[in-house]
Design a protein with these regions (language model features):
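Basic, polyanion-binding surface patches
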Residues: 2-178
C-alpha cells in the first residue's frame, strides 16, 4: 500500500489539466432575441440527465453576458457541433457577440430557437430549472424535439461528415463515428 498526502486545496490550473482528460461534446445553445441571433458555445453539456421529463444540462459561467438574454427566451436550440465545424466554433465562441453569426445562416423556429445547419444533431428545448454551482449556473433544459443527420433525417445539402466535435486536452477534435 502507498500512502500519499493530498494538497490542502486544488488549484484552478490543476483542475483544468485534470478535466482536460475528459472529452466533452461541443454544442451551441442559441435563440433569436429581439430579432438578434444569440448563442453560446458550451463544452459542458450533459445528455440524458433525465428521460422523463427529457432533460439535458449545460453549465454556463456566471460571468456570461449572453446567458441572461438566452435564459429569458421562450425556446432554445441546441446544435451538437460536428468535426467539420471546428473552425466555425471559434467564431461562435468569440467575445465579440455582434460577429458570432457573421456569414452564418442559422435556422430559427417560430418560437425563436436557433440552430446551426449541418450540425450532426439538433435539440429544441426550453429552460426547465437552474442551479447555482460555484462560478457556474447549471441550466436544465427540457427537450421538446430532436433530429440527427442519420437515416431519413439526412438532407441532400447536409455535409457527409457527421462526426462529433469534442473538446479534449484543450483542443477541438473530431470524434469519429463507429
Amino acid at each position: 500500500m502507498t500512502t500519499i498526502a493530498r494538497a490542502a486545496a486544488v488549484s484552478p490550473d490543476a483542475l483544468r489539466e485534470t478535466f482536460s482528460h475528459f472529452p466533452q461534446a461541443v454544442a451551441l445553445i442559441g435563440a433569436e432575441v429581439d430579432g438578434t441571433p444569440l448563442g453560446l458555445v458550451a463544452s459542458t453539456v450533459t445528455a440524458g440527465v433525465s428521460l422523463d421529463p427529457p432533460l439535458i444540462s449545460v453549465a454556463v459561467q456566471t460571468t456570461s453576458s449572453t446567458w441572461p438574454l438566452l435564459r429569458a427566451a421562450p425556446a432554445l436550440g441546441g446544435s451538437l457541433l460536428g468535426a467539420h465545424q471546428s473552425l466555425l466554433v471559434r467564431q461562435l465562441a468569440s467575445k465579440d457577440r455582434a460577429s458570432r453569426f457573421s456569414g452564418i445562416d442559422p435556422v430559427i423556429t417560430t418560437d425563436g430557437a436557433l440552430t446551426i445547419p449541418g450540425s450532426p444533431a439538433h435539440l429544441w428545448t426550453r429552460l426547465y430549472n437552474e442551479v447555482e454551482a460555484g462560478d457556474h449556473t447549471v441550466a436544465l433544459l427540457e427537450i421538446l424535439d430532436t433530429n440527427s443527420l442519420e437515416g431519413a433525417d439526412v438532407r441532400a445539402d447536409d455535409p457527409p461528415n457527421t462526426d462529433a466535435l469534442v473538446f479534449h486536452r484543450r483542443e477541438f477534435k473530431g470524434l469519429p463515428a463507429p
